Amino acid sequence: MLLFAVPMILGNIMQQCYNLADTWIVGRFVGAEALAAVGSAYTLMTFLNSILIGMCMGSGALFSICYGRRALRKLKEYIVSSFVLIFSVTVILTIVSYVCLDPILTLMQIPADIYGLMRSYMGLILAGLIFVFLYNYFAFLLRSSGNSVIPLIFLGVGTALNIGLDFFFVAKLGRGVKGAAEATVLAQAAAGLGIALYALVKEPELNMKKMKEEGIGIRADLLKEIFSYSASTGIQQSVMNFGILMVQGLVNSFGTSVMAAFAAGVKICLLYTSPSPRDISGS
């Protein structure tokens, strides 16, 4: 149990160190306006990410049951059906977020002086949702088999890459909030694609050729069961973050300076909480 839990705890510590470093880089090299914009965007992205993370968590519970029972055919069927389901939700969520971005920012009461900064940041950062899905889907799949080390390794690679790219894009190239967004998306891509490739190569249950030979495919009855698990955990994970998003909207009404202070305060408060390690979610 300890060997399984320690990598997850280390991943959480790693994520919080990244959050503080990233906040410092944006605030130090770009300014209070950028920190306010990125801080509000972080709250919105955390809400969107939590929906996908919760759905991946629900699928992970089903994977664990199959591993425990050694029901390998059922496991493969769950993997195929759940991947298609959550991938589809990710694509829909990304498109809807892009289309409704202006109304969302209006509802969040983003001040006019940073509206352009936040819209520019969000326009780039939403592209990373697909990589958030990939990382968390395969991380929960690996953890369901008892492997919590590999997800930690790829989280560490993504975190280190994110901090390094932040310094390069923001501090050296002076790309501002666009640079911060680009750094985050590239780090998410590295972590998400990396863990996906690892799982596809190393996990025998994910052998595509064998799945095809065994006639493994999408099953409508399993989609309903998976959706039941995934939707409930997705809602559970996102409810608290939706509340924080509402608080962020109230904070935004007080102006840029208060928003910047709130953004820094939230990152510090995260050090005193213990969420499970999730992803490189944003600046």
Label each residue range with its predicted role.
Residues 86, 141-164, 178-185:
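Alpha-helical transmembrane segments of multi-pass membrane transporters/permeases
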Residues 47, 162-163, 192-196, 271:
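Hydrophobic transmembrane alpha-helices of multi-pass small-molecule transporters
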Residues 17-36, 105-112, 168-175, 238-271:
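Helix-terminus/linker motif at the lipid-water interface of multi-pass membrane proteins
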Residues 35-95, 132-151, 261-278, 283:
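Small-residue-rich hydrophobic transmembrane alpha-helices
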Residues 1-60, 64, 228-251:
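Signature of the first transmembrane helix
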Residues 43, 159-160, 185-192, 267:
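Residue-level recognition of pore/gate-forming positions within transmembrane alpha-helices
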Residues 1-5, 63-128, 172-230, 275-278, ...:
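Short alpha-helical transmembrane segments in multi-pass integral membrane proteins
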